Amino acid sequence: MAPSFGSYIAGCLALIGIIAALGLGGYWLRRWIVPEFSGALARLADATLAVALLVVSLQILGSLSLLYFGWIVVFCIGVGLGSAWLGYSKAGGHGREVAAPRVQDIALVIALGVASWTVAEWTFPAQSSLDFGMFGGDTTWYHMPFSAFIAQEHSTVHLHYTDPLRLAAWFYPASTELVNAATIVLFKSDWLAPLQNLIWLPIGLLAAWCIGRPYKVGPATLVAAAIVLDAGVMIETQPGEARNDIMGLAFLLAFAAFLINGHQRRAPAAGAVQDAPESDAPLLDKGPLIMAGIAAGLAASVKTTFLVPVVAIAIGVVIFSGRGRRWTSAWVMGLPMLVVGGYWYLRAAIKTGGNPIPITKFGPLNLPRPDQMPLDPRPRFAVIDYITNATIYRRWFFPELENAFGPLWPLILIMAVSAAVYIAWKSRNKILRVIAVASLLTAVVYVFTPLTAAGQEGSPTGFFTNTRYLVPGLVLAMALLPLARPIRAPDRRAWQTLLFLTGVFAITVLTTPRWFTSYLVGTVFLTLCLVWAPAALSLARSRGSVSRPAIAAGAVVLVLLAVVLGRAQQVQYADQHYVNPDPFLGEGGPKEAYVYTQKLHDQRIGIIGSSQIIFGQYGFYGNDASNHVEYIGVHGPHGANRLPTSCAQLRGLINQGDYDYLVMSQYTQDTGPYNTGVANPYQFPVYAWVKGDPAVMLVVKDNLASPQPDYVFKVEGKLDPSACKPEKRPEVPGEEPIE
């Protein structure tokens, strides 16, 4: 059942107030920090500051365990208005706006067309998720469970254990999940979660435009980035899901845009900038450095994979700042980067006893990390493991690269690498060289990253989805491509480059259309809100053809329409999501467990089992995401979570958890001595350990689930650990042998 109409209106008013206050705060802070920014660049800075204010505000509330409706509304609005007052009092009318070179109207139309198509194509999976639920593996494994847990606990202090895997996902940065948690609190529903990534996509496209803005090639840099952002792997993994790559990509591009525009602040009154600014000028003024640090912090607060390009670019900027300016550049950019992006790493360091990134020991430093069992979603092969295997290229890498980046993937990769190498080697612009080197370094690190070719040996089934880890370097390199001097000067050559990139975009996206007529009305409305209206109002305002009251009136109309349509969508989402998991889970997931637990409210559910339980666990949170779901494990030092290794231990943990229900598979691993004869010391018969206890009642038995049956038990009392029968099992590394 959907939340009441009154709670919906309260949530809408709260969200509108928060967005308005934080937007106002971002606007006036930008007027103070970078008064020279204008047009699209100013709007990008406004958005970046507003998002940073939101994320930091929620982190503060989460640290104080105050993520309640009232506190979120009052504190976020207060922070926004306080920031607006501070910016207004400090701005003082100082600083001259630097206008961008005027682009041709036809180039602007092409850029808007590409942006519209990209956003429109993203809306279809988003609307599908609003109808059926989010079924992406990472979404249901940890992204949405983290959001629901934070919303339920009203806190970011505690770790939420989702599995016993080596990755220790509960230490991942979680800014996207935190924003989703806030919307769950505001609306008493997670119905906005499938739409969140549609907010970050336009910010990423705007940032891509701004990368080329001072060179008069903004349309070309937008199109080049859109080739990657609208590629198959992005469409399959981002829109309509809680995966967070797009938020990181948006602010990584913003990081680059602020550095490039800040470096070229002394642009001529007309025409594009030259390759280098004044010889006696500092590399960057403090304002652009602050903005760059904020954007970099936001990117790093999303996903650890963004640390490579962020840190590489930051180090390069400091090095090239020159003697006598390096320390100033380091602290001016580094301080906001740490404030905005350091929260999750600080939390991890506190929980582990000193390690901000617990997935690694940092080599000789040997920092503490959780002692996880050596279990992975798939065998952890990297691309480098198959680097000389021609068969893998032919059967896996080449076909999946085509699925990920379209039929022109060889051309796209060649263009990206060539642009990055050329700019790193030949450009006289230090900032461009730093970004180019960072993009190449990110690609190299991707090749060596575990799980980029995950799967059984000789069968890297995880290669396609994990090409996402190549995307940060690829999108940076593609955005730099139109800045290479041989293809942007003179203007005629820049125009040819734009047309060529538009052709590549068209071939890439038109070969795999994902348009559904039943969603066209929603697509038109979302594209209107996210692309057409902002672009039209901004363009009209910059050319003086529309007054501010008219812009405000247009915004009010769109907001009112969104509120009306939103209620209908919220009700439909409550009635339909996760009701029919068959088209998505097929025979590979806990379908009957989904159907049963969707009817439960405010129940404590313990889960244990193999992959289908781990990766599908968000479906057990119930229709209103009110069930408290956690993986039943043995908590250890430094934030570890390990499998129980005996019947008595499992029953004791169930008693400690005070669960109302249990959801489990037959074994904790899909292969092992109990069913395949393969040696696997981590395959435990958890169903057999529990089923005979009179304190549990079997309510769901799904023998058709694959690769092994799933079960739901209702817990009616305390289980008896002493009643477990003696058994002899394979010895578990790191555990005492049990007879």
Where are the model-predicted features located?
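Transmembrane-helix signature of polytopic, membrane-embedded enzymes
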Residues: 36-46, 191-192, 208-231, 249-250, ...
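Membrane-lumen/periplasm interface segments of specific transmembrane helices
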Residues: 319, 327-415, 559-567
